[in-house]
């Protein structure tokens, strides 16, 4: 998240200050040279105390901005775990417990992120509350099927259009959803000054991997479909798929 003043072009901005939140051991030297950027390492794929701390520092950073400041924000896959601010009545231990349960029981990324939205004060469009209708340009690196903005990092800056019924979950998850008071997505006017653009997709990464693999001399097969599910099932699928490619 970067703050810049109203009198600067977005393509020639004078960065006032910013905050960078990424995975443990993933901060590059190119970022660390900027003294006006606060750099934070957090946890992925399961949230920890670092995720809660990152959420608090992000909110404090946004709320410290002046009313006429503008924001440039990059959101990528992994943000759901890296940054969190929990709804009242939800503890970090519970968040970790339920996240591990969802990850280990074959739930899709959409189903996992839908649950995360329900127990969060910033996911599912709710980070827009803290931006308080300031002008914002949000750029996305997508890691989800169909590149749905409401799914990438659990959609902190877009109105939630990916509502999944509680019936999609097992009793262990549904019991928790019944007990907590879930946060509500803000009204439409909170999103009017937020401009969203996808700048990179899974397809870009796949094509780059394909190109590099071919350049290294490997026999390469490009898989068109997005694959997700239980690793036990998928390992069998890929074994059969690769076997068929050789015939």
PLM region spans:
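N-terminal loops that bind phosphate or other acidic moieties
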Residues: 1-247
């Amino acid at each position: 998240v970067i703050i810049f003043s109203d009198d600067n072009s977005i393509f020639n901005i004078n960065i006032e200050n910013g905050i960078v939140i990424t995975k443990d051991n993933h901060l590059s030297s190119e970022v660390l040279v900027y003294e006006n950027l606060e750099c934070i390492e957090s946890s992925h794929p399961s949230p920890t105390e670092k995720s809660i701390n990152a959420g608090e520092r992000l909110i404090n950073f946004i709320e410290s901005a002046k009313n006429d400041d503008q924001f440039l924000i990059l959101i990528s896959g992994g943000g759901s775990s890296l940054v969190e601010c929990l709804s009242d009545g939800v503890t970090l231990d519970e968040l970790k417990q339920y996240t591990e349960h969802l990850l280990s029981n074959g739930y899709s990324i959409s189903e996992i992120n839908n649950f995360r939205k329900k127990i969060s004060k910033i996911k599912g469009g709710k980070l827009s509350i803290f931006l308080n209708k300031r002008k914002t340009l949000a750029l996305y690196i997508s890691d989800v099927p169909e590149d749905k903005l409401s799914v990438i990092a659990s959609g902190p800056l877009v109105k939630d259009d990916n509502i999944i019924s509680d019936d999609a979950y097992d009793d262990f998850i549904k019991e928790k959803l019944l007990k907590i008071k879930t946060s509500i997505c803000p009204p439409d006017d909170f999103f009017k000054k937020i401009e969203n653009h996808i700048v990179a997709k899974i397809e870009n990464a796949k094509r780059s991997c394909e190109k590099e693999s071919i350049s290294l001399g490997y026999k390469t097969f490009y898989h068109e479909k997005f694959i997700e599910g239980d690793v036990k099932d998928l390992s069998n699928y890929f074994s059969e798929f690769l076997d068929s490619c050789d015939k």
